[in-house]
């Protein structure tokens, strides 16, 4: 179809939207392109927001049009058009969701708006007729009061039938003077002559009927007043408690200035670390104490070795002064004396090493005992 048809369809759609009082902005470019995202909001507004009676009909059929995807929404709309309005669209569901068929989509939207508006008018017209019938019945019962005065006979005369009953309306009320109503025709004449006055009287009656309820609502009961008093007392108590809490907080802040708060776990960790550092310091001091006697032992060994060498030299000198004959006779003894000196040195050194080994063993035992004691102390601190 030509572009002029698209413009004409858009004009028709604008007219329908005016009848709906559509408050949102319309994406005309999307409608011309055939974008379904431009037409779906209009359809959802016509079904859900325009008329409450239409929404009630949809609920009665068990159809929901909100919180759905585009495909589910179109399926529900086609179901409503088929079941409620007996309307079959030109396009299929898949074609409607495509970005094409702009003129046909606009025509479908216009048809949907027409169907909804027509249905709304039908429902509102039926409701108006029902309300008017109810009002007529009520007004006929209230207005017509048949009475028979004492002076007048029960059978009416011809003159009285020709005269119309006198009706006097008081402002703000529906009370009538006593009238003579002899037939239903007279009642119909009264209703036809004074429709406006009936509507005004009905409004006054409604106002009067509403006013006592309003006064009853505005005047609170004694129970409500007592409840309010109790609530006020509770609020005052809570405010006093809050004041006490604020005072305590201020006192705590003043007392805790310059102080640091630490968790128990962190404090225990710090204590354990301090104990470890102290034990390490003690062990290092004891190691230094152990190293001092070892130095003394080395010095003593050096002194003993120097003494032994001096003695050997002195012995050699004395033996050189002895004559050869004496050397021959006592050569065996010289050899023995020469051989015995290193043996004595070895014996002295072995005794020293044994003493040093014993002292190191004792020291190691002491160190192990100290380590065990420190580990026990650490376990006790962690448990506490």
UniProtKB/Swiss-Prot annotation:
It comes from Xenopus laevis (African clawed frog). The keyword Cytoplasm applies. Binds to centriolar microtubules. GO terms for cellular component: centriole; centrosome; cytoplasm; midbody; spindle pole. Residues 221-260, 353-378 form a coiled coil. The gene is cep44. GO terms for biological process: centriole replication; centriole-centriole cohesion; centrosome cycle. This is Centrosomal protein of 44 kDa. Residues 201-210 have a biased composition (Basic and acidic residues). Keywords: Coiled coil, Cytoplasm, Cytoskeleton. Residues 11-188 are annotated as: Binds with microtubules and centrioles. InterPro entries: CEP44 (IPR033603), CEP44_CC (IPR029157). GO terms for molecular function: microtubule binding. It is found in: Cytoplasm, Cytoskeleton, Microtubule organizing center, Centrosome; Cytoplasm, Cytoskeleton, Microtubule organizing center, Centrosome, Centriole; Cytoplasm, Cytoskeleton, Spindle pole; Midbody. Centriole-enriched microtubule-binding protein involved in centriole biogenesis. In collaboration with CEP295 and POC1B, is required for the centriole-to-centrosome conversion by ensuring the formation of bona fide centriole wall. Functions as a linker component that maintains centrosome cohesion. Associates with CROCC and regulates its stability and localization to the centrosome. Residues 191-222 are annotated as: Disordered.
């Amino acid at each position: 179809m030509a572009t002029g048809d698209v413009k004409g369809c858009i004009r028709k759609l604008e007219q329908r939207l005016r009848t709906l009082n559509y408050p949102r902005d319309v994406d005309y470019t999307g409608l011309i392109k055939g974008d379904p995202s431009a037409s779906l909001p209009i359809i959802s507004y016509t079904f859900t927001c325009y008329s409450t009676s239409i929404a009630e009909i949809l609920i009665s059929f068990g159809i929901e049009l909100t919180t759905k995807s585009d495909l589910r929404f179109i399926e529900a709309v086609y179901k409503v058009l088929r079941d409620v309005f007996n309307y079959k669209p030109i396009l299929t569901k898949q074609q409607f969701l495509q970005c094409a068929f702009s003129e046909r989509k606009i025509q479908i939207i216009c048809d949907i708006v027409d169907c909804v508006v027509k249905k709304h008018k039908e429902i509102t017209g039926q409701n108006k007729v029902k309300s008017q019938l109810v009002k007529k019945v009520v007004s006929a019962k209230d207005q017509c009061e048949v009475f028979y005065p004492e002076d007048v006979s029960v059978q009416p005369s011809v003159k009285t039938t020709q005269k119309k009953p006198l009706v006097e309306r008081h402002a703000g009320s529906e009370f009538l003077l006593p009238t003579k109503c002899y037939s239903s025709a007279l009642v119909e004449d009264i209703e036809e002559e004074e429709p406006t006055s009936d509507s005004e009287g009905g409004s006054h009656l409604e106002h009067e009927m509403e006013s006592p309820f309003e006064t009853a609502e505005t005047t609170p009961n004694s129970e409500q007043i007592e409840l309010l008093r109790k609530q006020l007392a509770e609020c005052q108590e809570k405010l006093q408690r809050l004041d006490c809490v604020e005072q305590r907080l201020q006192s705590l802040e003043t007392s805790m200035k310059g102080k640091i708060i630490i968790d128990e776990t962190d404090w225990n960790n710090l204590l354990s670390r301090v104990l470890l550092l102290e034990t390490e310091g003690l062990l290092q001091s004891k190691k230094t104490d152990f190293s001092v006697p070892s130095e003394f032992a080395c010095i003593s060994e050096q002194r003993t070795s120097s003494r032994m060498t001096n003695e050997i030299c002195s012995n050699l000198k004395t033996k050189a002064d002895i004559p050869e004959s004496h050397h021959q006779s006592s050569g065996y003894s010289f050899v023995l004396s020469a051989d015995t000196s290193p043996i004595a040195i070895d014996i002295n050194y072995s005794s020293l090493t044994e003493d040093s080994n014993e002292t190191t063993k004792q020291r190691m035992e002491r160190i192990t005992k100290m380590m065990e004691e420190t580990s026990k102390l650490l376990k006790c601190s962690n448990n506490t």
